[in-house]
UniProtKB/Swiss-Prot annotation:
Recorded topology in the membrane: Multi-pass membrane protein
Protein name: NADH-quinone oxidoreductase subunit A
Main localization of the protein described in the UniProt heading: membrane
This protein's UniProt keywords: Cell inner membrane, Cell membrane, Membrane, NAD, Quinone, Translocase, Transmembrane, Transmembrane helix, Transport, Ubiquinone
Molecular function (Gene Ontology), one example: NADH:ubiquinone reductase (non-electrogenic) activity
Subunit structure comment from the entry: NDH-1 is composed of 14 different subunits. Subunits NuoA, H, J, K, L, M, N constitute the membrane sector of the complex.
Transmembrane segments: 24-44, 77-97, 106-126
Keyword NAD: yes
């Protein structure tokens, strides 16, 4: 019976592509056409555009004023530390909030896991505090 079913199937252009196959073919043609347009516009701008290379063209534009210093001033380290601490504790809040939503489903195992997580972060915070990572003032010598 299986051999009869296989032998009676017709193979035509519609049988090669399922409806999803036609959608993917249309998407592939769209992406290819978009890439061709982008590349052709970039090449046209490259070959047809006006080029003038002067030292003045290489300077950054600051509202018509000549640049006076470096483009990227350095920021004090405490700002970076604050950003890193924010990310660490923001992730901690996300874990604790997700635990709080499902605490009744997690049982004692979930409580033990979140307690271990909080204790680990508290130990890390105490370590950073002892090392002086949280001190913003002048360094003691």
């Amino acid at each position: 019976m299986v051999s009869e079913h296989i032998s009676t199937q017709q193979v035509g252009p519609d049988a090669l592509f399922s409806p999803l196959g036609w959608d993917l073919l249309a998407l592939a043609l769209y992406v290819a056409l978009a890439c061709i347009i982008v590349v052709s516009l970039l090449l046209a701008a490259r070959f047809l555009g006006h080029r003038s290379r002067t030292p003045l063209k290489n300077l950054p534009y600051e509202c018509g004023v000549e640049p006076t210093g470096p483009a990227r001033p350095g920021y004090p380290v405490p700002f970076y530390l604050t950003a890193i601490f924010f990310v660490v504790f923001d992730v901690e809040v996300a874990f604790i909030a997700s635990w709080a939503v499902a605490y009744d489903l997690l049982g004692w195992a979930g409580l033990a896991q979140i307690a271990f997580f909080i204790i680990t972060l508290l130990v890390a915070l105490i370590y950073l505090w002892r090392r002086g990572a949280l001190d913003w003032g002048p360094q003691r010598r």
